[in-house]
Amino acid sequence: MLAAVIFDMDGVLIDSEPFWQRAQIAVFSELGHPHTVEDCESTIGVRIDQLVAHWYRLRPWSGPTQEEVVLRILDQVNALILSEGQAKAGVLEALDLIEARGLKVGLATSSPFAMVEAVLGKLGIRDRFMAVHSAEVERFGKPHPDVYIHAAEKLGVEPVHCLAIEDSFTGLLAAKAASMTALIVPDPALVGDPRLAIANYQLGSLAELNADMLASWVK
């Protein structure tokens, strides 16, 4: 029986994936390595330091350190969130439905805590989450399950009794590895991807979620 719902953040609560794309393309281009949308899509859900390390291995640059590149990307994404960030369709209604069922609500994200606070503050939903956890403090980010396991721990719920809501295959792997039930609301780049079949449930948007559907999952 489900006792909690744990949301991913980027691409689930807020349509921030385009912000990450714009920031990566701008920063990597400044380093002399033109970055494409396809490059960005290949690393959706990956923790930012691991993402930068990945591209450094493939396309090493001179000058700024990897840590400095991480900060440049984060600064740009944060600025875009504060100026343009909006809740994804159905998010507020989904939170209402989940709370009405008496389920605990948590967050498990690859983004750093500072960005989490920026997003939740921008959307005005910080008080809706009983527990927030970031892979920033984990040895490994998604697809490793620790960020989900420790988010569940903060909620006081066993992972097997949690529903994880994800938009990326990387995050979906993390949720399943944590023994959670998984709902995928796929990023547009992943629509139709056969790998998403490992999810327990799939919706095109959180706006499709309704009380009867949630009740059937909770049992």
Language-model features: locations:
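Helix-loop "lid/cap" segments that line or gate small-molecule binding pockets
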Residues: 27-28, 47-62, 119, 152
